[in-house]
Each structure stands twice: as C-alpha cells, then as structure tokens.
Amino acid sequence: MTRISLPTTISAAPVAAQPLLEGVNKLLGSVPNLFRLTANSPAALEGYLGLNGALAKGALDAQTRERIALAVAQINGCNYCLSAHTYLGKNLAKLDDAEIAANRNGGSTDAKADVAVGFAVALVQKRGQVSDADVQAVKEAGYSEAELVEIVAHVALNTLTNYLNEAFGTPIDFPVVSAAAA
C-alpha cells in the first residue's frame, strides 16, 4: 500500500501531469506505478522524464545504463527498481542472468562495464566523494569524460527513483525481484 496517492488512471492525475503520463503511455504502452506516483508532482515528473530522456540520447549504451540501475537499486534496497530493471535489462538491454547477478553485486561480466558499474557503486557508497584513482580507472577503461558525467547522472537519476519508491511504498507492477535475494 502506497503512502501517497497513486492515480489509477491518467485522468485522475493532476491536470499538469496528464500530458506527461500520456507520453509515457504512448512510449511504453502502459503507465508503470513509478510514473503514476511521481505524477503527484507534475514538476518532479517533468524533471524526471526530461533527465531520463536526455540521458537516453547520451554516450552510454542501454546495457551500461541498465547495469548501473541494477547496482544502484541493489545498494539502496529498492525492490521496485530491481524488479523494473531486471525486466528491462532482460527484455530491452538483453542482459543475461549472470550479468544481472553481477550487476546486483556491483560488477559486470564484461571487463569494461565492470569498471563503470564499480564506479557507480563507489559514487553511491562514498556519496560522490570518489578519489582521483576512482576517476582515473574509469578513464583508463576507455570511458570518455562525457560518459563519466553520465555515469554520475545515472546514479543520481536512479537514486531519485529508488528513494521515491522506497519512501512511498510504490506497488511493484513488474515481475517481483527482492534486494534480499542477491
């Protein structure tokens, strides 16, 4: 049970959020509960969708974005996001079970991606206070400065959704995955 309203239909959401939810519905074919919950603040929904959309056009590929989302959700204990990104990782990014397990454990089966995921984990654990060596390792793995910035942005974006879902008890509307099961 959520702690705040979860509009059951697009028309039940605040008027300013309705066109944003229509866009989500058009893109995904449905409106997952995360978006319904965030629609309580049209400004927050617009900000989330804007950053998410911009980063989707960035330098990091979909696989790396999903790997980061899984690692961050695991650290933050967000079952909603673990469930969503396990589903998206398998079905859209084509990550296999071994890769998803590695991501949830803070790494990757791919050597280059392992460095990016490890950096994302360091960002969360150190609250952004990473070392010169942390940054240098990502550069040496072949990531550009644009990709470095995007890793930080993805950590922030995923932390936002983790906190929204955990703070307000968003009902999981994906096949359920538990943080305790990593």
Regions found by a protein language model. Name each.
Residues 1-182:
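Hydrophobic alpha-helical segments
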